[in-house]
């Protein structure tokens, strides 16, 4: 239950940010018949920002699995990828950003 509530909180923050910026849509999720899933896809100007949400306080490399595979499943270019989670360690220098949920705004304003 904790994970679902955490994910819902992050989705709501993304939606609030987009609406406050004057965007009326462009927030999606991805799930296919093989149960591959990405929690948030932000589509803007023909490009995608993909976000995986994890309530865990500890980072695991498996958090990035679907973000790495996403380009095999969709045609729209994925320009940014991030894991937003409950832990303190952050990394914004790699192909997939790792952010504490309190710093979600850094991803949304980038």
What are these regions (language model features)?
Residues 1-110:
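A cross-kingdom feature that marks ATP-driven nucleic-acid transaction machinery
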């Amino acid at each position: 239950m904790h994970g679902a509530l955490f994910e819902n909180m992050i989705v709501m923050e993304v939606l609030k940010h987009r609406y406050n910026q004057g965007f009326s849509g462009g927030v999606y999720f991805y799930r296919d018949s093989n149960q591959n899933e990405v929690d948030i896809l932000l589509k803007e100007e023909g490009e995608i920002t993909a976000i995986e949400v994890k309530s865990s306080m500890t980072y695991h490399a498996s958090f990035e699995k679907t973000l790495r595979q996403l380009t095999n499943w969709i045609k729209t270019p994925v320009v940014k990828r991030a894991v937003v989670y409950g832990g303190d360690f952050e990394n914004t220098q790699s192909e997939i950003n790792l952010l504490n949920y309190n710093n979600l705004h850094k991803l949304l304003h980038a």
